[in-house]
Amino acid sequence: IDKYRKWDYKMPENFKSYLYISQLLQARGIKTAIEAHRRAKPFCMGTLYWQLNDCWPVTSWSSMDYYGRWKALQYYVKKLYSEVLVLPFVENKKLNIYIISDRLKNINGRLSLWLKDFDGTILWGYSSDVKIDANTSKPYFSIELEKLVGENDTCSIVLEAEVKEGKKLLSKNLFYFVKPKNLKLKKPLITFRHMKTEKGYR
């Protein structure tokens, strides 16, 4: 775990943080594999990951623990195995936006892309109607990385990609230009409210 963690993440401050980072590391690794397999359609028409759950309380590869609690990976694979997946992928110094569809009918959708900084400011945007071919994986947009990034600091930006069918969101994916340990994340100010209801809290 520590060997691979050093590739992508900084040293966690304590054991609790170490456990959390190890879950993110696992989720990111499996995400990379599943996206590659799905992008390779029709040469790869399916993929399984090891493993779904545990038969006793243990440190393992599972995406759910013995008690059925979801780890980071379980949240990732729920989105990764959606029937439509939008996928930013770098090839030959270009950022290509693939859309993978497992549906057996064509989709009239809309592809939207935004380059944002970590304050949420939109630095660049693109939107276009797309006819998503049934049961395929192919690129629907391409741009030179250098042109997209421009003068922006790659450690401080993210590309947000989404595909909609009408008002329904089919897929959303984020693309970072550097490893997580190199991101210049700002400490957020998070506020929340909760309210007691008959069914619990919301």
What are the residue ranges of the model-derived segments?
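Substrate-binding clefts and catalytic carboxylate motifs of secreted carbohydrate-active enzymes
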Residues: 1-110, 114
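Short, contiguous acidic/charged loop-to-helix segments that flank catalytic cores in large enzymes
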Residues: 20-22, 64-65, 129-135, 148, ...
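Residues that act as N-cap/strand-start positions at coil-to-secondary-structure junctions
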Residues: 31, 80-82, 124, 184-189, ...
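Short hydrophobic alpha-helix segments
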Residues: 59-60, 126-128, 173
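Short linear motifs in intrinsically disordered
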Residues: 85-86, 102-106, 147-153, 191-194
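Beta-strand-rich binding/interaction modules
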Residues: 94-143, 153-164, 201-202
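Short acidic/polar inter-strand loop motif in beta-rich domains
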Residues: 163-171
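Edge strands and adjacent loops of beta-rich recognition modules
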Residues: 170-201
